[in-house]
Amino acid sequence: MNGTTSSINFLTSDDDASAAAMEAFIGTNHHSSLFPPPPQQPPQPQFNEDTLQQRLQALIESAGENWTYAIFWQISHDFDSSTGDNTVILGWGDGYYKGEEDKEKKKNNTNTAEQEHRKRVIRELNSLISGGIGVSDESNDEEVTDTEWFFLVSMTQSFVNGVGLPGESFLNSRVIWLSGSGALTGSGCERAGQGQIYGLKTMVCIATQNGVVELGSSEVISQSSDLMHKVNNLFNFNNGGGNNGVEASSWGFNLNPDQGENDPALWISEPTNTGIESPARVNNGNNSNSNSKSDSHQISKLEKNDISSVENQNRQSSCLVEKDLTFQGGLLKSNETLSFCGNESSKKRTSVSKGSNNDEGMLSFSTVVRSAANDSDHSDLEASVVKEAIVVEPPEKKPRKRGRKPANGREEPLNHVEAERQRREKLNQRFYSLRAVVPNVSKMDKASLLGDAISYINELKSKLQQAESDKEEIQKKLDGMSKEGNNGKGCGSRAKERKSSNQDSTASSIEMEIDVKIIGWDVMIRVQCGKKDHPGARFMEALKELDLEVNHASLSVVNDLMIQQATVKMGSQFFNHDQLKVALMTKVGENY
């Protein structure tokens, strides 16, 4: 395929392609062409195939969409000693095949010859894996689906960084989501085009710190932020220290219940080293340690008694496929999980598991190779080898790059993937805060949230402008009322007469008191003043001028004191407490 560093042509039906496929699966000298060798400097983290496969399975099973398969493309380095170039390669790390839930989508468009070619390739692979032992032909009549064949072919592919769908996603640290047949064919990537030919309608590549997670489905699935969040939680983590293995305890749940804490495969997972460490390397720099003497004794004893079994295990572990894996006549049956790996110790677990609850086939391949030594006999030895190796090899100091100093007191600056992840987390927090402020959110996606926030801000602006205009109008009316009270026509002489009469009144003159209570548009008014000069008439006239509708009114007189109470409702103009009190004081008490 275009944009891959290596691939095997399974798509043709000739005998040469089948022979090439057989050689690719079992060849001990040519498997390096399928998957580039791991780099020497710097070492990349090597995943445990069981935990990685279970992560992929958990990702698909927990997703609300119907995903057909999931593949993890793991990064490695192809170092050229002559030129000094270090090329980043994305190779097959592991995969999980679930299949289509819709039975109609399993129908193939291939002819009989193509189906026979696929069955023959899988039968030959099964025959080579099982060592020539006869296999049952119960499932020979079942067809190999297009998506299943596409998933199988993907095992033989690898991509240069920046080339192909996974390479472009990893280079740019972004998500590539192709949904629909038009998007797949128009992407310009040959892998996406092949996926569309073999029945896929959605392909997704999500870059992580250690590789790319690819998902495919025979249905059209729209972009989901929840899926990307799950991928970040499952596959983005730090692999610090010199240990290349990934412990199951570093995850939030036990991904490998079949292996205990003493399983050395969780500690030592170097693909190219399947033998036992020599005593000279183990005891380097720590000759006086009693544990080193015990390790040397154990190593010499093992080399003396078990050298034949170790050599046999070394020969078997050089193959890429495990002999205890079978295709059951070349085809997948209901709820079967197939695992390709170079780990001889995987014989402890059944490679093909059958169930009655799920009718879908599950296909899984892995290129991760672990130590082929006996786990139960050499667990203490391998654990001590790890401890000594960590002590002997000091961490290499990386040269500091010129430029800005790392922020927040970090010794090393964050890489672009970690920085992008933190930026997205901060952006998501801002969106959560914005969603809490906006009252009416139409949809939960970010675009709709921004649109609703803009509409809400514009609405608040219009309300503010309306309130300011109403305030200006009320202020103008109050200014006009105050001017009328000070410069009333024909009322100056009468005001002087009233003031003089008030001065001639008794020393115990009564001051005017106005109490106002506003409840919505309803107002309760209480006026207490003297009974001279008809304050009741002035009060009713003031209510009329202020456009206040009277619902109830009462007037009582005690000696020289008059108490007026009224319940009114505001009309066209809304007054607050201070505005209404000032207006009534001006109208009723202008001649008081």
From Swiss-Prot:
Domain bHLH: 411-460
GO biological process annotation, one example: extracellular ATP signaling
GO molecular function: bHLH transcription factor binding; DNA binding; DNA-binding transcription factor activity; protein dimerization activity
One Pfam family linked to the record: bHLH-TF_ACT-like_plant
Biased composition (Basic residues): 398-407
Primary location: nucleus
Localization per record: Nucleus
Keyword field: DNA-binding, Nucleus, Plant defense, Transcription, Transcription regulation
Organism: Arabidopsis thaliana (Mouse-ear cress)
One GO cellular component term noted in the UniProt record for this chain: nucleus
Gene name of this polypeptide: MYC3
Biased composition (Basic and acidic residues): 294-306, 408-422, 468-482
This protein's name: Transcription factor MYC3
Signals that turn on the gene: Barely up-regulated by jasmonic acid.
